[in-house]
Amino acid sequence: MRCCALRARSFAAYHRRFMSASVADRLADTFGTKGSPISLQTACASGGAAIQLALEAIRRGEAEAALCVGTDGSVSPEAVVRFSLLSALSTRNEPPAGAARPFAKDRDGFVMAEGAGALVVESLASARARGARVLGVIAGCGEKADSFHLTRSSPDGKAIIASISQALSDAALEPDAIDYVNAHGTGTPENDKMECLGVMTVFGARARDVPISSNKSMIGHTLSAAGVVEAAFTLLSIAHQRLPPTINHNVPDPAIPLDVVPNVARDARVRHAVSNSFGFGGQNVSIVISAEPA
């Protein structure tokens, strides 16, 4: 019976249910790609890590292009209960649209979301040769794990600082060159505090003048998909020269003295930006995204 099911190709539906790598496998099968279909899980840093793997493979000459996909569909009663037991979710959800309050003094947790994002990452020469519209350039990546706690960041912020610093070094840019930071910005009391520490350490006296915003305030936290989704936000910020706001920022936190682009989108000159993704388990990925060079 098993052989008959395989012969009839009816096994695919079951395969997709129990194989964690099935998303990458199905995409490879659909598009006929020849590179290795890799699925990875580094919690909320997964999407950023996928982009990093693509960048490194292209730099090594192993690939001309890669399809980087971040996707998550974790909203379920069990997941809500588990995150609630961690005190990670916002409980102030009336009205629901005001529940996510990254960087605000009255923040109390994140809002779960489902979503997906996809980026075609390829060498600039390849993109130009086929006449592709180039939204931006992945200029550098940095990653660092702090191995401190399953759900908490190390209070010294060293891994976050190292992640951002490595990304800047990889992109051959100084902190002064960065025009915008797309924050991980979950809205949990501890995460936002640690990200603020990292940004202020890396950017020094200029940190207060670097716009930093969290699109999670508008769309919620897409978990494993967040790195790719937020890289897309960052690319569009560069393409349109417009910064997405951090909405629901009605009670500023004196302990986070940053320009969080409160409540209203803003036109701005953006040549170079950083996108941060920090995951449970201590995985941290930062990506530097730049405008296409002339």
Question: What are the functions of these language-model segments?
Answer:
Residues 1-4, 13-53, 62, 85-111, ...:
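Conserved catalytic cysteine-centered active-site region
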Residues 171-177, 208, 256-294:
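Flexible, low-complexity linker/loop segments at domain and module junctions
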Residues 4-11, 52, 56, 74-129, ...:
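Glycine-/small-residue-rich "gating" segment that lines the acyl/pantetheine channel
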Residues 50, 163-171, 202, 234:
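Stable alpha-helical structural segments in soluble proteins, enriched in small hydrophobic residues
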Residues 62-108, 141-155, 183-192, 209-259:
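Acyl-CoA/ACP chain-elongation machinery
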Residues 94-171, 180, 294:
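Condensing-enzyme catalytic core mediating Claisen C-C bond formation in acyl metabolism
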Residues 27, 47, 54, 83, ...:
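Conserved small-residue
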Residues 119-123, 169, 191, 200, ...:
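Short beta-strand-to-turn element immediately C-terminal to the catalytic PLP-Schiff-base lysine
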